C-alpha cells in the first residue's frame, strides 16, 4: 500500500525534491502538495515510530531552528538511520520507504538526528503509535536539538496552538510520557514513518488542509508537519512545521466549539424519534398510550403539564383535575409512554413525588369461547362492525396455541358498550361451528408496578401485621395448626375447581359430539330438502314443458282448422262461381224460348234445314199452319198429328234430296208468292229479302 501510494502520488522522492527544491525553500510548496508528500508520510508514519521512535517529539520546539537548519545538517545522519531501520517493527512498510530515500538523500536526514536517541525508540514505539506519524515530520528538524527533545516536545505543545487544532483528546497522552519516543520515531519516520503512521498520516494531511482535523491533533503539542516530514527533507519540514502550527491554531478553536454546541443542542432539543420507537403497523394515540399522573401540585397549569412531557413527542389529549391533583395525557406510541413513565415516575415537583402509571382502558372487552381457528385479524374484522378498534389479540399459551380467550380494545366507550349488549342479547358466531363468543368487560390488573411499600397504607392494622417478620411456623404451634387448615381449605377448593373443570370438559365434549351428530343430520336434512326442492322444480319444469307442448298442439290444431276453413271457403267460392255460371247459362237457355223461330231453328240445327228453301213444304201439307210458324214441326204446331208431320217431313226430305235447294228455288219461289195456301210471307226462310225482328245476334 505505502509503495503504491508513494509511486502514484509523488513518483518517488523526486517529487519532494521537485517541489521542495531539496532544501527548506520548497517546504511550503511541499505542504501545498499533500498527495505525494503526505501520502508517503501517512503510510510510513506508523512504521517510523517502531524503528526510530525517539525522533518525533523534537521537531515542535525547533520549528524556528528547523527553518535555520536546512538540508546540510541532515545528510550525515542519514547513514545511521539505515541501522535503525532493520528493527523488526517496520518490516513490511520499511521496504517501500527505502526507494524514496535513495532518490533523495536528504530525506534520511531525519534518522540522522535520531541515531543518538535510537536506543529509546523501541520502548516508546509501543506506547505512542499515534505520535510517530504526527511527529514524523518534525523529527527531521529535531536532529539538532535531539538531546533536549523530551523537554522541548512538551514545550512545543503549549507554544504552538496547533495542539488544540490537531485534536484535544489525542494531545494530552502524547505530551505526557510518550512524546520523546515519537520524536525518535520521527527521525526514522521519513523512511518507516509511512508504515505505522499511514492511517493517521492519511487523516492528518486531510486535516491540516481543512483546518484542524482530529488526526492532526494526535501529535499533541507537536506541529502537524511531522506527518509529511517523515518522507520529506528536513528543510521542508522546518518550514512546514511553523506553517502547520499556524494553520492548526486557527482551526482548533473552531473545531471544538461546534462540537460542544452540538452536544448542548442535542441535550436541550432531545426528542424521541417515533419512527424508531413504533412497531410496524402500530396505531398512534391509542388508549394504551394514555398515562395517569397523580400527586400533581394544585397550581399546575396545562402548559406546564405539557412541557413535562414535551421531550416524549407531541401529546394527544390532556386532562387535569387540579382539585384532586391528577391528570391524564396521551402520547404517540406505547414505547414513548413506557419511556416517559420510567423517567418521570417518582420525579419531585414542587415538593411532591409524581406518580405515573398507565391509565386503565375503559373501552376494552374480554372475549371467551373462541375457536382455535380464530386469529387476531379475524377477531378484529368480526368486532369492527361495532366501531373502530385499536387492538384485537387472541391470547395463546407458551407454545403459541390458542387458549380460547382474547381481548378487544375499542377506540370509544359507545362502541364497546354496543358490542357488549349485542353479543350478550344475541348469538355472535365467528366460524362455521355454532360456537358463540362470550363477551365480558375486561378485568384490568396492574402486574408491572404492583404495590410498593411507599404506597401501602400505614394504618394500625398495617402496624400490627408488620410487627412479626416473615418466618416458618413451628410444628405443634397454634400458627402451624391453623395454617394447615388454611392449606386444606385451599386444597379442597383446588379439588372442587378441578372437578368442576372436569365436569365442564365432559359436558363440552358431550355437547360437541351431539353437535357433530346433529350437524350431520342437519346436513342430511338439508340435502333431502334440497333434493325435494330439485324434484319439485323438475316436476314444475315438466309441467311447464307439457303445458308448452299442449299449447303448441293447440296452435297447430288452430292453424290446421284455419287452413281447412280457408280451403272450404275457397271451394264454396268456386261452387258459387260455377253455380252462377250455370245459372247464367240456364238463363241464357231459358231466354232462347222467346227467340225468333229462325234463330231457334238456326240454333237447333237439323229441324231448320227441312223447311229452308223447300218450295214444296207448304204446298205438300194438307193444312196450312195455324199460327204461321216458320218451320213445320211438332213443337210449333202441336195440333198436327205426328203422322202427318212425319209424312210431310218425309216428303220434304225426299224433295230436298231429289231437287237441291238451289234448283228448286225459283219454282218454290213462284209457287208460294202467288199462291194463297203457301207459307205466310213473313215466315219462309227461302225469302231472302225478308229480315225478321230478331235479326241481331244475342251473343
UniProtKB/Swiss-Prot annotation:
Name positions with the PTM N6-acetyllysine: 200, 311, 330, 413, 464
Return the annotated region ranges for 3 X 3 AA repeats of R-G-G.
9-27
User: What does the entry's PTM section describe?
Assistant: Phosphorylated on multiple serine and threonine residues during apoptosis. Phosphorylation of C-terminal tyrosines promotes its cytoplasmic localization, impaired its binding to polypyrimidine RNA and led to cell cycle arrest. In resting T-cells is phosphorylated at Thr-679 by GSK3B which is proposed to promote association with THRAP and to prevent binding to PTPRC/CD45 pre-mRNA; T-cell activation leads to reduced phosphorylation at Thr-679.
User: Which residues, renumbered to this chain, carry the PTM Phosphotyrosine?
Assistant: 285, 683
The annotated regions of Gly residues compositional bias extend over 9-26, 198-220, 604-633, 660-684
Molecular function terms from GO: chromatin binding; histone deacetylase binding; protein homodimerization activity; RNA binding; transcription cis-regulatory region binding
Segments spanning the bilayer are none
Query: In which ranges do the sequence repeats occur?
Result: 9-11, 19-21, 25-27
What is the location of the Glycyl lysine isopeptide (Lys-Gly) (interchain with G-Cter in SUMO2) cross-link? 263, 271, 330
**What's the entry's take on its domains?**
The coiled coil domain mediates interaction with NONO, and can also mediate formation of long, linear homooligomers (in vitro). The coiled coil domain is required for optimal DNA binding, and optimal transcription activation.
What biological function has been recorded for the protein in this entry?
DNA- and RNA binding protein, involved in several nuclear processes. Essential pre-mRNA splicing factor required early in spliceosome formation and for splicing catalytic step II, probably as a heteromer with NONO. Binds to pre-mRNA in spliceosome C complex, and specifically binds to intronic polypyrimidine tracts. Involved in regulation of signal-induced alternative splicing.
What name appears for this protein in its UniProt entry? Answer: Splicing factor, proline- and glutamine-rich
**Which source organism does the UniProt entry give?**
Mus musculus (Mouse)
Q: Give the organism's phylogenetic lineage.
A: Eukaryota, Metazoa, Chordata, Craniata, Vertebrata
Amino acid at each position: 500500500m505505502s509503495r503504491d501510494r508513494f509511486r502514484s502520488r509523488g513518483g518517488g522522492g523526486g517529487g519532494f525534491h521537485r517541489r521542495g527544491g531539496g532544501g527548506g525553500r520548497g517546504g511550503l510548496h511541499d505542504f501545498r502538495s499533500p498527495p505525494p508528500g503526505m501520502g508517503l508520510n501517512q503510510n510510513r508514519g506508523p512504521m517510523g515510530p517502531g524503528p526510530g521512535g525517539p525522533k518525533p517529539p523534537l521537531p515542535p520546539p525547533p520549528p524556528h531552528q528547523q527553518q535555520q537548519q536546512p538540508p546540510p545538517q541532515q545528510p550525515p545522519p542519514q547513514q545511521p538511520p539505515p541501522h535503525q531501520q532493520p528493527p523488526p517493527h517496520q518490516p513490511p512498510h520499511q521496504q517501500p520507504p527505502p526507494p524514496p530515500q535513495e532518490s533523495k538523500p536528504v530525506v534520511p536526514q531525519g534518522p540522522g538526528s535520531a541515531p543518538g536517541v535510537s536506543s529509546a525508540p523501541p520502548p516508546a514505539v509501543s506506547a505512542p503509535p499515534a505520535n510517530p506519524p504526527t511527529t514524523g515530520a518534525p523529527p527531521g528538524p529535531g536532529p539538532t536539538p535531539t538531546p533536549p527533545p523530551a523537554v522541548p516536545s512538551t514545550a512545543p505543545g503549549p507554544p504552538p496552538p496547533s495542539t488544540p487544532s490537531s485534536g484535544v483528546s489525542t494531545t494530552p497522552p502524547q505530551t505526557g510520557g510518550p512524546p520523546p519516543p515519537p520524536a525518535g520515531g520521527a527521525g526514522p519516520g521519513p523512511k518507516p514513518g509511512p508504515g505505522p503512521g499511514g492511517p493517521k498520516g492519511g487523516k492528518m494531511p486531510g486535516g491540516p488542509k481543512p483546518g484542524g482535523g482530529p488526526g492532526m491533533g494526535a501529535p499533541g503539542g507537536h506541529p502537524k508537519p511531522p506527518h509529511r516530514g517523515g518522507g520529506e527533507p528536513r528543510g521542508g519540514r522546518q518550514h512546514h512545521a511553523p506553517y502547520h502550527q499556524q494553520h492548526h491554531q486557527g482551526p482548533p478553536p473552531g473545531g471544538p466549539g461546534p462540537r460542544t454546541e452540538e452536544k448542548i443542542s442535542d441535550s436541550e432539543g432531545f426528542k424521541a424519534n417515533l419512527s424508531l420507537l413504533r412497531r410496524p403497523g402500530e396505531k398512534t394515540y391509542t388508549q394504551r398510550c394514555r398515562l395517569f399522573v397523580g400527586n400533581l401540585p394544585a397550581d399546575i397549569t396545562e402548559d406546564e403539564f405539557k412541557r413535562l412531557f414535551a421531550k416524549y413527542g407531541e401529546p394527544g389529549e390532556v386532562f387535569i383535575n387540579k382539585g384532586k391533583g391528577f391528570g391524564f395525557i396521551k402520547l404517540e406510541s406505547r414505547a414513548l409512554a413506557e419511556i416517559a413513565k420510567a423517567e418521570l415516575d417518582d420525579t419531585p415537583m414542587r415538593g411532591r413525588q409524581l406518580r405515573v402509571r398507565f391509565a386503565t382502558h375503559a373501552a376494552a372487552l374480554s372475549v371467551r369461547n373462541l375457536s382455535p381457528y380464530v386469529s387476531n385479524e379475524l377477531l378484529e374484522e368480526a368486532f369492527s362492525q361495532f366501531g373502530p378498534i385499536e387492538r384485537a389479540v387472541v391470547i395463546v399459551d407458551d407454545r403459541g396455541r390458542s387458549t380460547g380467550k382474547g381481548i378487544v380494545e375499542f377506540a370509544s366507550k359507545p362502541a364497546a358498550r354496543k358490542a357488549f349488549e349485542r353479543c350478550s342479547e344475541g348469538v355472535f358466531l365467528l366460524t362455521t361451528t355454532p360456537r358463540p363468543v362470550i363477551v365480558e368487560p375486561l378485568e384490568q390488573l396492574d402486574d408491572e408496578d404492583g404495590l410498593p411499600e411507599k404506597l401501602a397504607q400505614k394504618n394500625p392494622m398495617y402496624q400490627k401485621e408488620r410487627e412479626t417478620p416473615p418466618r416458618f411456623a413451628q410444628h405443634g404451634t397454634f400458627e402451624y395448626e391453623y395454617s394447615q387448615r388454611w392449606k386444606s381449605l385451599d386444597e379442597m377448593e383446588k379439588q372442587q375447581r378441578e372437578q368442576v373443570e372436569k365436569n365442564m370438559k365432559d359436558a363440552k365434549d358431550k355437547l360437541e359430539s351431539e353437535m357433530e351428530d346433529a350437524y350431520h343430520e342437519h346436513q342430511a336434512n338439508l340435502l333431502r330438502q334440497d333434493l325435494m326442492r330439485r324434484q319439485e322444480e323438475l316436476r314444475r319444469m315438466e309441467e311447464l314443458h307439457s303445458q308448452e307442448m299442449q299449447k303448441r298442439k293447440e296452435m297447430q290444431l288452430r292453424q290446421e282448422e284455419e287452413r281447412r276453413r280457408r280451403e272450404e271457403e275457397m271451394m264454396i267460392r268456386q261452387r258459387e262461381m260455377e253455380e252462377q255460371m250455370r245459372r247464367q247459362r240456364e238463363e241464357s237457355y231459358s231466354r232462347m224460348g222467346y227467340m225468333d223461330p229462325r234463330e231457334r231453328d238456326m240454333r237447333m240445327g237439323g229441324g231448320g234445314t227441312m223447311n229452308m228453301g223447300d218450295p214444296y213444304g207448304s204446298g205438300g201439307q194438307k193444312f196450312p199452319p195455324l199460327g204461321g210458324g216458320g218451320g213445320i214441326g211438332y213443337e210449333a204446331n202441336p195440333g198436327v198429328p205426328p203422322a202427318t208431320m212425319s209424312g210431310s217431313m218425309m216428303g220434304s226430305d225426299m224433295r230436298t234430296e231429289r231437287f237441291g235447294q238451289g234448283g228448286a228455288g225459283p219454282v218454290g219461289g213462284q209457287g208460294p208468292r202467288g199462291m194463297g195456301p203457301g207459307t205466310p210471307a213473313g215466315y219462309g226462310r227461302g225469302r231472302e229479302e225478308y229480315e225478321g225482328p230478331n235479326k241481331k245476334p244475342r251473343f
